[in-house]
């Protein structure tokens, strides 16, 4: 857990504002999700990985288990599914801190800032193109040049595995590392 001093805080806040304005220009609406929620709501339909990265505490009023969010995407999905009740595409964006029980890699923060844009209710190729374009503009605005694009479609992953012609053990190790988003481990498996 680290402090962000004035000069760096100013840069981060300027970038956050710029990116939220960018997302708004594409029609995305800002949502702010709770930092802490009851576990049954926070982790519904989520992966074991998210459960492992979620800090858990006992609510002193109700005695129920609560969690401090480790990801905002599931909360945004819940807002779309249960709160907005809209027809057609729904575009939501967010920017806030999350908290992880352990860092996701070497030299990474346990309290990272997450910013994102989510498009719900539309599954055409236009949706994919829109999100890749937004991602590209986001990376360019952040002056990030060394880019690795991670596409979360298992069909793409399986096709790449076939092309790579890896043995079964390596495929299994790679799949586990990808699911856990352990980027250092992915590099290690691919370079072995």
Summary of predicted features, one role per range:
Residues 1-192:
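Extended, charged alpha-beta segments that form solvent-exposed binding/catalytic grooves
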